[in-house]
From Swiss-Prot:
Residues 1-20 have a biased composition (Basic residues). It comes from the Bacteria. One of its GO terms (biological process) is translation. It comes from Polaromonas naphthalenivorans (strain CJ2). This is Small ribosomal subunit protein bS20. GO terms for molecular function: small ribosomal subunit rRNA binding; structural constituent of ribosome. One of its GO terms (cellular component) is small ribosomal subunit. Belongs to the bacterial ribosomal protein bS20 family. NCBIfam families: S20.
Length: 106
């Protein structure tokens, strides 16, 4: 399982102590955004697997917004954000094409 990290020594300088306080806040904010990102991506992928085109499109728009936010804040590199959006978009688009082809075959 995961082992606890060894405790770091406290900084001596005031600027170092302030930096530690800031890091704790930033870490919490970044972790929250990453979690939001993972949840959004999973929701889009679930909708695609379920074959729900409208829901997938709606969730993709929300996921796209979250990915852009994370990229703007510098949590993810802009290229990673673009790559993730592209892959999700391809899945949603493939679902839409599949939905269009299915009625004509039946």
């Amino acid at each position: 399982m995961a082992t606890a990290k060894p405790k770091k020594k406290n900084p001596r300088l005031a600027s170092g102590r302030k930096r530690v306080r800031q890091d704790v806040k930033l870490n919490a904010a970044n972790t929250s955004l990453r979690s939001k990102y993972r949840t959004a991506v999973k929701n889009v992928e679930k909708a695609v697997l379920a074959g729900d085109k409208d829901k997938a499109k709606d969730l993709f728009a929300k996921a796209q917004s979250i990915v852009d936010t994370i990229s703007d804040k510098g949590i993810f590199h802009k290229n990673k954000a673009a790559r993730d959006k592209s892959r999700l978009s391809a899945k949603v688009k493939a679902l839409a094409l599949k939905a269009v082809e299915t009625p004509t075959a039946a």
